[in-house]
Structures are given as C-alpha cells and as structure tokens.
C-alpha cells in the first residue's frame, strides 16, 4: 500500500495509458496527407575528372593549392659555412641567429680577450646544444658549430655525433678553449 502511494506520488504507476499510444496510428494534417508522393529524384550524373597534375607553373589564383609549406631558413641550395671573427661578446647573438638559419659557423676567437672568448664559446655552445647541433674544436681558439642537419666527420672517418662530447684536458696554465689535443694535430 505504501509502495503504491509512493509510485503514484513519484509518477510511476502501472497504468496502460502508455501502451495505448503505440497502437494508434499517427495522424497528419490534411495539407501533408493530401499531397501526392514526391517523385524519386535521380542523383546528378557523375562527371569524370582528369587526374590532377601539379607543376611549377601552378599558381594560387587558378584554384589549385599546394599544401606543402617550406621550413624557414632551409633552402635547397648548397650548404653555407660562415666564418666569424668577433671582436666582442656582443656579436654572439648574431652567431646563434646564423645557426638558427641552418648555416654552419667557424668561430675564430684569436682576436678576443681570453676571458671574453671563453664566455663567447660557452654562449654559442649552449645555443648549439639547445638546437641539437654539433660543436668541434678545429684549432687553437677556432671552433666549428653546426646545426643538427650537418654531420661532422674527421679525416680518419670517425663521425662526431651530437650526443658525444669532445674530450678535453683541463690544465691550470691553459684555458679550456685554447688547449689543443693531440688528435687534432694529425
């Protein structure tokens, strides 16, 4: 009894009202019922197309678009090596920008003060590391910095990978950037 009252209060009653609605057919307004059935519409005829051929003369104005976007700073010409002989540390951001343009940089620090030259090497080496580039000491106070698209190898055929670090011998008499290893003298 209490359960029945609760069902009635909530609105869950076991009446057959709902079942009656499904047995009746739907009634349409007279305007819809009096219309004759629509004729079947034939699909539009298929137009055969010629295969699309793209060439260098295709322009945007013709309606055909090329979705390939070139990488900034990358061109299909010959790789470029820029030799930089800075006189101060203020020129180092320009070296980083050159590396970002995917150009290799030979950095000759012979004309700089040793302390400022060490700072310059550290700065450019950090930028090169951040870009997954490569660095190599190629002479006394001369360094090669390359972007990650350039593979550096020596005459002996050993390639220098980005995860390898160059072996250096520390000495109190020589700064790290100026000490030449015996393997470079070969």
UniProtKB/Swiss-Prot annotation:
Residues 14-59, 157-186 are annotated as: Disordered. Gene3D superfamilies: SepF-like protein. GO terms for cellular component: cell septum; cytoplasm. Its main location: cytoplasm. Residues 16-27 have a biased composition (Acidic residues). GO terms for biological process: division septum assembly; FtsZ-dependent cytokinesis. It is found in: Cytoplasm. Belongs to the SepF family. This is Cell division protein SepF. It comes from Synechocystis sp. (strain ATCC 27184 / PCC 6803 / Kazusa). The lineage of its organism: Bacteria, Bacillati, Cyanobacteriota, Cyanophyceae, Synechococcales.
């Amino acid at each position: 009894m209490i359960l029945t009252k609760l069902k009635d209060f909530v609105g869950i009653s076991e009446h057959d009202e709902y079942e009656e609605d499904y047995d009746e057919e739907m009634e349409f307004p007279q305007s819809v019922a009096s219309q004759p059935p629509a004729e079947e519409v034939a699909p539009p005829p298929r137009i055969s197309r010629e295969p699309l051929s793209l060439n260098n003369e295709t322009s945007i104005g013709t309606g055909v678009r090329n979705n390939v976007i070139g990488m900034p700073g990358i061109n299909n010409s010959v790789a470029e090596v820029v030799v930089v002989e800075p006189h101060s540390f203020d020129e180092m951001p320009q070296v980083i920008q050159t590396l970002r343009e995917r150009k290799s940089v030979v950095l000759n620090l012979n004309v700089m003060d040793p302390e400022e030259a060490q700072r310059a090497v550290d700065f450019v080496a950090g930028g090169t590391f951040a870009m997954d580039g490569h660095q190599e000491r190629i002479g006394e106070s001369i360094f090669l910095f390359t972007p990650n698209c350039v593979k550096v190898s020596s005459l002996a055929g050993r390639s220098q990978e980005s995860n390898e670090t160059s072996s250096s011998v520390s000495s109190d008499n020589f700064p790290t950037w100026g000490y030449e290893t015996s393997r470079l003298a070969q």
